[in-house]
């Protein structure tokens, strides 16, 4: 057994079932090893950003890692933007990055690079194997670390000679660490502060936004009439009919400040206090109300459901939560589609258990608002703010749950970053509906130009925000997918 075979067998033994890949010459031993694994599905992406984004979508929807297979430092670099999003989303994910054979590095061949340096900013853990057998050991470590609550990005660098080297052995599995929990004393203290607050709120993120965790947030709301608020860009939000409803923090800083105004106490579970996405002249960066008591009770690596349940119990909250969402069917005027009636139609038709990948940009407010009362669904959004996520995440979500309908809400400009994902959707016959927002512009940047104080921008400035020449939405119709205009 060579090192590549030992690694792939170790990954399969650890429950890894999918490899999203864009391999090169240095990964051919790994490609051959995947071929011998009946339990591992291999999915090709034509661009590394599709590969890493798909692994992110898969990990968000399964809470376990897929593996990516990437070609040296440049291949990894091509996938970094969506690894940034995955890291911000705290997704369990394993990257396998091929490297030159150890003895070949001294020649400084054209594709030689500092892979550790490239990987480190977008990874929580990086390791280069030391031998063929150590390649499997590194894989076992990555399986365990990637699933440390709520999830981590692990990168294993595989030198070519370690992949082809013989006499390698399969590594034993390593037990995944159990989630950390809050002390009884901290729970009791937080309960008393919430009970004594005049205008309280729960501010939630990460796994606090799953249905079972939100149930306990709703219990607390029923006890003290607290607002339940989530991050602007949550990694995975379960919502719709039968789920405790939640308010989403607005994107723009001044709107967020107004949204939080009047709160006297905010308890944070699974999220830090919010800040503005960017600095602006004469606009706030810190968004929480001045004078409000801010309690950071549980960071994202603390068991969120356990925290909320014990907090509700300590407050003697009722078992029946408040703010359970009911389903609503919207009446709309027929005619030319706009963001509001398109959102109403989507909300009316969204099937139960659907998965929404949201990169709708400036159209997103309408879709998020109207689908709040749709059938139960999962909502995945661009958590790290790096555009080009929407289509690849939809791929990963559809691979994770082939029996569930996936809807990709995709702004036209950001979709062009990873347009190759459509090819993978067609190749894998994935059940995905892609709804394109034909803005013909970088709509958000037209807004931001004014917000940073630029008045009367000239022709050259505006041309950098215009997507109408040529109309890029046409590009979406040429990748073997059936389309409706």
Task: Name every feature range the model reports, one short phrase each.
Residues 2-81:
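N-terminal cofactor/phosphate-binding cores enriched in small/glycine residues
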Residues 17-18, 60-97, 120-172, 190-200, ...:
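Structural signature of the thiamine diphosphate
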Residues 22-24, 43-53, 68-75, 130-131, ...:
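Active-site nucleophile and cofactor-binding loops and adjacent substrate-binding regions
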Residues 33-35, 54-65, 80-92, 223, ...:
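Alpha-helix C-terminal capping segments
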Residues 60, 206-297, 374-404, 416-420, ...:
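Glycine-rich, anion-gripping cofactor-binding loops and their flanking helix/strand elements
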Residues 96, 104-111, 366-479:
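Thiamine diphosphate
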Residues 133, 270-364, 479:
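Phosphate/pyrophosphate-binding active-site segments
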């Amino acid at each position: 057994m060579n090192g590549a075979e030992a690694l792939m067998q170790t990954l399969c033994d650890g429950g890894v079932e999918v490899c999203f890949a864009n391999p090169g010459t240095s990964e051919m031993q790994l490609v051959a090893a995947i071929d011998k694994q009946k339990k591992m599905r291999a999915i090709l992406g034509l661009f590394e950003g599709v590969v890493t984004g798909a692994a992110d979508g898969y990990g968000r929807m399964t809470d376990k890692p897929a593996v990516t297979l990437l070609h040296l430092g440049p291949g990894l670099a091509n996938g970094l933007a969506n690894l940034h999003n995955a890291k911000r989303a705290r997704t369990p994910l394993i990257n396998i990055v091929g490297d030159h054979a150890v003895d070949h590095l001294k020649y400084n061949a054209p594709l030689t690079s500092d892979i550790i340096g490239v990987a480190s900013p977008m990874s929580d853990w990086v390791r280069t194997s030391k031998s063929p057998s150590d390649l499997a050991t590194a894989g076992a470590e990555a399986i365990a670390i990637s699933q440390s609550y709520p999830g981590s990005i692990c990168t294993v660098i595989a030198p070519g000679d370690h992949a082809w080297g013989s006499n390698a052995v399969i590594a034993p599995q390593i037990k995944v660490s159990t989630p950390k929990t809050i002390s009884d004393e901290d729970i009791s203290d937080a309960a008393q502060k919430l009970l004594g607050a005049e205008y309280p709120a729960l501010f939630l993120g990460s796994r606090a936004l799953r249905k079972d965790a939100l149930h306990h947030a709703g219990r607390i709301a029923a006890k003290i009439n607290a607002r339940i608020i989530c991050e602007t860009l949550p990694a995975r939000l379960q919502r719709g009919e039968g789920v405790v409803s939640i308010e989403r923090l607005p994107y723009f800083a001044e709107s967020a400040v107004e949204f939080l105004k009047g709160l006297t106490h905010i308890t944070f579970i699974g999220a830090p206090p919010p800040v503005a996405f960017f600095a602006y002249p004469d606009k706030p960066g810190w968004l929480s109300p001045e004078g409000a008591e801010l309690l950071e009770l549980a960071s994202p690596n603390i068991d969120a459901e356990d925290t909320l349940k014990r907090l509700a119990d300590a407050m003697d909250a009722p078992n029946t939560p408040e703010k359970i969402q009911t389903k609503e069917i919207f009446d709309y005027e027929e005619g030319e589609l706009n963001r509001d009636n398109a959102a109403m139609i989507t909300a009316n038709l969204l099937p139960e258990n659907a998965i929404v990948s949201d990169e709708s940009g400036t159209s997103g407010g309408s879709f998020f608002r109207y689908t709040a009362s749709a059938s139960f669904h999962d909502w995945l959004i661009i958590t790290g703010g790096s555009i080009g996520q929407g289509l690849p995440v939809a791929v990963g979500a559809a691979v994770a749950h082939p029996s569930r309908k996936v809807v990709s809400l995709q702004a036209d400009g950001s979709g062009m970053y990873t347009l190759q994902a459509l090819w993978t959707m067609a190749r894998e016959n994935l059940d995905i509906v892609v709804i394109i927002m034909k803005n013909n512009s970088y709509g958000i940047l037209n807004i931001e130009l004014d917000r940073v104080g630029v008045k009367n921008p000239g022709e050259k400035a505006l041309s950098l925000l215009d997507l109408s020449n040529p109309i890029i939405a046409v590009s979406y119709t040429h990748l073997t997918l059936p389309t409706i205009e």
